[in-house]
Amino acid sequence: MSARPKPPTRVRKTTPTKKVKALPLSKSEIPFRLEPWHTNGRRSNNCYAYAVNDYESYRFSKSVPGERSGKPVGFHTYTHCKGLADRVISDNPKKVYKVPAAKKCKNGYYKIMMVVAPSNKYGNFTGDFHFYKQHGVVEYKMKEGDTYTSIAKRFGVPYSRILKAGGGTPIKVGKKLRFKANFFSHKMGWATGPLETDASGKLIKDPRKANRKYGYNYSKYCCSMCVKNRGVDVGSTNSKVGKDRLKTL
């Protein structure tokens, strides 16, 4: 008796990964640069201050939406979005406005997004807020181990663009590159410098579609806002705060 034929092997269908569409630029975005946020500014500037480009050399507390305008700080659990956009706008009423995520900001403004964490792995009943800001240009200082290919991959741009930014010359540590790239960055409180990747290590093209699950799971998208690209202030108005306004353009 002949052997029974084996059933055909089933091929599992895989769902192709959807490419995240980049959001429109106003061309007034703050360039992505690590310094001074990565070193001297790491501890004194949280995600809110970073998103609106309000660098200060010293802060005695983290910046909170509504604090600058004098609203009570401790009223919100940050597990929901109610009232938060109004608090952000109240800090800079003529310099911030709400906008649909897919709509371009007007000239002189750039886009930020706000999310909150309804849950966390620590068992805390309070949540947290978090902000992202959009960029259209990268200012990058080359470091040991960099290649034109690795930089292109990191920022999701063609190799030829990085090669052109480098003048077509060999890699040199310390050399500064400037090139176009459309993505969002964020800063994890006082713990990190600027980050262009999400919790999965992927470049953030649209924060709404990024992995936002850290110790706090920032699963709730609140809104997008357009922020004036200069002169925005957040946090305490205490006289001890030393201001080092960055040149933004």
Residue ranges of predicted features:
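Cysteine-nucleophile protease catalytic domains, especially the papain-like/related folds used
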Residues: 4-95
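...with weaker cross-activation on analogous glycine-rich loops/strands in unrelated enzymes
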Residues: 76-139, 181-191
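Primarily a LysM-type cell-wall glycan-binding module
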Residues: 138-158
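Sec/Tat-exported extracytoplasmic proteins
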Residues: 55, 59, 155, 159, ...
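Short acidic, glycine/serine/threonine-rich helix-capping segments at coil-helix boundaries
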Residues: 144, 159-176
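Active-site or metal-binding loop neighborhoods of secreted/extracellular toxin and effector enzymes
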Residues: 176-249
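Extended terminal accessory/targeting regions
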Residues: 7-8, 14-21, 124-129, 186, ...
